[in-house]
């Protein structure tokens, strides 16, 4: 097999820097990581200094993604020799067991880590990930709630809990989690969009109004958010057709829906898709606009 350095005329420093970039950007093209990482380890280990150990870890995780347990085990053995007793290396052992679906073995490792260090967030999160992988969502929810009592600022955990509640159709609790995220991330359009989707799913005029407002805010923060634009359209349409809505509310929401539909039409025209796709999409939007005109009349 040809070497990466020969194929692309790059130096070992280039490959080292590329591995660093992939780590920092959470790049998940695992086959590339293995290819570049293995060449660095096999051909340039003496030049890498302490960087060699993070590359071993990076290659190991990529190997687990690709089902290459032989490579993963080789990297893990090197890390164990260098860092005997390290909690980080023990967690990597747990990840290998997870990849092999040996969940009980992985849980034993994470429990031992937590006995030594109850504040080890990585081990606690892996336990929760195992509950999810096993389909034991109620246990994952319980453990996430316990975790957030101690680490209330962990935004990733709040979002994971929201997703679990959505999967369990517990929309009120999902909305609470998303509100927590909005409070700490008031400029993140995705959280507004997701909160709006939850309120829309809950239904009822009050929730629909909240849904429309949060879709609107998501669009203000990111005017390219097509999902929020469609959300604004559909929530406005449902409010306009709700028998409990006042005449003014209906009129206002027809206006919002008409605006959203016109923006959707513009977006399709600018998207540069194939003519057939564009014509089909535009016909759907024109039907939307025609429906609104009928409603308004």
Curated annotation (Swiss-Prot):
Q: Does the keyword Nucleus apply?
A: no
Intervals holding TPR repeats: 87-120, 155-188, 192-225
Q: Which GO terms describe its biological process?
A: protein insertion into ER membrane by stop-transfer membrane-anchor sequence; tail-anchored membrane protein insertion into ER membrane
Membrane topology summary = Peripheral membrane protein
Instruction: Quote any Pfam family the record assigns.
Output: TPR_EMC2
Q: Which UniProt keywords apply?
A: Endoplasmic reticulum, Membrane, Repeat, TPR repeat
Q: What is its main location?
A: endoplasmic reticulum
Gene3D superfamilies documented for this protein: Tetratricopeptide repeat domain (1.25.40.10)
Quote a single Gene Ontology cellular component term. Answer: extrinsic component of endoplasmic reticulum membrane
Q: Where in the cell is it found?
A: Endoplasmic reticulum membrane
Q: Which InterPro entries match?
A: EMC2-like, TPR-like_helical_dom_sf, TPR_EMC2, TPR_rpt
Subunit annotation: Component of the ER membrane protein complex (EMC).
Q: Identify its protein family.
A: Belongs to the EMC2 family.
What does the function comment of this entry state? Part of the endoplasmic reticulum membrane protein complex (EMC) that enables the energy-independent insertion into endoplasmic reticulum membranes of newly synthesized membrane proteins. Preferentially accommodates proteins with transmembrane domains that are weakly hydrophobic or contain destabilizing features such as charged and aromatic residues. Involved in the cotranslational insertion of multi-pass membrane proteins in which stop-transfer membrane-anchor sequences become ER membrane spanning helices.
Q: What is this protein called?
A: ER membrane protein complex subunit 2-A
Native organism is Xenopus laevis
């Amino acid at each position: 097999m040809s070497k990466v350095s020969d194929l692309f005329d790059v130096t070992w420093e280039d490959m080292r820097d590329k591995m660093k970039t992939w780590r920092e950007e959470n790049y998940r093209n695992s086959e590339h990581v293995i290819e570049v990482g293995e060449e660095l380890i096999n051909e340039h280990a003496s030049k890498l200094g302490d960087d060699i150990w993070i590359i071993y870890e990076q290659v190991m995780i990529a190997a687990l993604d690709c089902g290459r347990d032989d490579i993963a085990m080789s990297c893990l053995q090197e890390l164990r020799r260098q860092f005997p007793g390290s909690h980080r290396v023990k967690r990597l052992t747990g990840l290998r067991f997870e990849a092999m679906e040996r969940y009980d073995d992985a849980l034993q490792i994470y429990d031992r880590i937590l006995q030594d260090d109850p504040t080890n967030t990585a081990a606690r999160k892996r336990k929760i990930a195992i509950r999810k992988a096993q389909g034991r969502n109620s246990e994952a929810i319980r453990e996430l709630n316990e975790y957030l009592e101690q680490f209330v600022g962990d935004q990733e955990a709040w979002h994971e809990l929201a997703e679990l509640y959505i999967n369990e159709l517990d929309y009120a609790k999902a909305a609470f989690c998303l509100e927590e995220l909005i409070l700490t991330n008031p400029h993140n359009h995705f959280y507004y969009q997701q909160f709006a989707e939850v309120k829309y799913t809950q239904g009822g005029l009050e929730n629909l109004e909240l849904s429309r407002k949060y879709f609107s805010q998501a669009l203000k923060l990111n005017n390219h958010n097509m999902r929020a634009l469609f959300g604004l359209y559909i929530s406005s349409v449902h409010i306009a057709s709700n028998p409990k809505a006042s005449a003014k509310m209906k009129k206002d929401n027809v206006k919002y829906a008409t605006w959203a539909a016109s923006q959707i039409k513009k977006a399709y025209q600018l998207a540069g898709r194939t003519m057939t796709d564009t014509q089909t999409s535009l016909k759907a939007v024109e039907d939307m606009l025609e429906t609104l005109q009928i409603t308004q009349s």
